[in-house]
Amino acid sequence: MIRFWVDTFDIDGIRLDCANVLDFHFMEEMRRETKTMKEDFWLMGEVIHGDYGRWVNDHMLHSVTNYELHKSIYSGFNDHNFFEIAHNVRRLEAIGRSLYTFVDNHDEDRIASKLRTKEHLLPVYTCLMTLPGIPSIYYGGEWGIEGKRTPSCDDALRPAISPDAFDSLRCTLTDRISKLGIIHQENEELHMGRYQELLLTNRQYAFARHGEHSLIITALNNDDNEAVLNIPVPMAASQAVNLLEDGEILPIRDGKLQITLKGCDGAVLKIKGES
C-alpha cells in the first residue's frame, strides 16, 4: 500500500494512527522497506503515552506525537507552573528534538478552550514553536478558534471554515504565529539545537537553543503583569536581537540579558557569539 502511494502520488511520509498498538517487528520492516523507496521517507506515529524511545529510533519511526508536552503546556500555563513544562522537556531531552509537538489536534479540545486565560495564547505558541521538537499548527489554531468535544461528537474540533472568512478571522495571534513560523524556518538553532534551561520560576521561564556559534533564547511570562527578567547568557556576546520586535537590540552586560516582558507574552532573542 505504501509503495502504491509513493509510486502514484509521490508521498514523502505517512502518519500511523494508534502506533502504540502496532507490532514492533512490523514497524521495523516498514522502516527498511520505505527506505528503499525514498531515502528520506518519514514515518510518524500517534502514541499517547509510554516510553517514546521504544518507537522513535534508527530502526522504527522517525517521530511520534508528544502528548506529554501537550499536557504540560496547557496545564503549565493554567496553573502558573512553568516547572511542569521544564521538567517534561528535561525528561525527554534525549529524543525531544525528534518528537511531533502540538497544542491542538483533531482529537483534543482546542487550546483556546483549554486555557483559562485567553491572553496566554501568545506565549503558548511562542513556547511551542521554540521548544525542542517538530512543531505543528492545527488548522484554525492561528485564529484562536475554540472547540470542545462531547461524549458523542467531535465536530466542534473540526469546523468548516470558508476561505471567505480568513480575513475577518485574522488577529494578533495570526500575525504572531506567522512570525514564529518564519523565525523557526530561518534559524537552525530551533531545528535540532541543544536545549539549555536558563531561568525558571512558576511564572517566568527562559531557555536557549544552541547553534554552532549562536543562540536563540526564548523568554516567557505567564503572569498578568509585566516582569523584568535577568537572563544568564551562556555565550560571550555583547547584544541580542529581539526577533519578535522587528530587530530591537538589547545589550548584554556582565553575561546577563535584561528584558521586560509584558504580561502574558514572550520574546525570542537571537545572539551571535563573539570570536
Which stretches of residues belong to each language-model region?
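Carbohydrate-interacting/catalytic domains
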Residues: 137, 141-275
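Active-site-proximal helices and loops of the catalytic beta/alpha 8
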Residues: 7, 17-95, 99, 118, ...
